Regions:
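A glycine- and Lys/Arg-enriched "phosphate-lid" helix/loop adjacent to the NTP-binding pocket
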Residues: 89-166
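Pre-Walker A (Motif I) flank of P-loop NTPase domains
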Residues: 1-3
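Conserved nucleotide-sensing/catalytic segment adjacent to the nucleotide-binding pocket
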Residues: 45-93
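Hydrophobic anchor at the beta1->P-loop junction of P-loop NTPases
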Residues: 6
């Protein structure tokens, strides 16, 4: 059993990947957490550059609540929340720094984090995510910088790429399933 998180900019296939992994017998007893952005948006929480410190705190609380489980597969991690916080226009720089300092405390709770490389993957409009390529690149840049900055707090970080089947093979090799 492990806490497994996937990190990556929007529209790289995190949710699709988690749903496919959930079908495998090795993950039968895992809690699967996906697509919380739509749910939270429907509660009235602003997303992307419109997000607020309250909104990002709710997103962080969602991720932390997932970490209360010993067997977890999630399509978002605390790193994702941190990366989007950095792009929120209404949050002051000092508040962003304080938020990141607090959020990083939970990174060590993941047993594995898989970063999904966005190279060659087109943005899909699901009605929730931002479809602007420049914004997507900023989020990916933030994610990479956060991984560099806080990598020492991450137990097992792996980069995966390719189509869903190739990604699953890479994950299973890492997890030794």
């Amino acid at each position: 059993m492990a806490r497994i998180g996937f990190v990556g900019t929007q529209s790289v296939g995190k949710t699709t990947l988690v749903k496919e992994l959930a079908k495998l017998p090795q993950f039968e007893y895992y809690h699967v957490a996906t697509e919380r952005s739509k749910y939270l948006r429907d509660l009235g929480i602003p997303l992307n550059t419109d997000s607020t410190i309250k909104g990002q705190t709710v997103f962080l609380a969602e991720r932390v609540s997932e970490l209360l489980r010993d067997n977890l597969i999630t399509d978002r991690t605390i790193i994702d929340v941190m990366a989007f916080t950095l792009e929120a226009k209404s949050i002051e720089p000092g508040v962003k720094a304080d938020f990141l300092y607090y959020a990083k405390q939970f990174l060590k709770e993941y047993d594995y984090i898989f970063y999904i490389d966005p190279s060659g993957i087109e943005i899909e409009d699901n009605g929730v995510r931002e479809t602007n390529n420049e914004f997507r690149d900023k989020i990916d840049f933030n994610i990479k910088n956060l991984i560099k900055s806080y990598g020492g707090l991450i137990n097992n970080l792996h980069t995966i790429s390719g189509d869903t089947d190739n990604r699953i093979r890479q994950i299973m090799n890492v997890l030794k399933f």
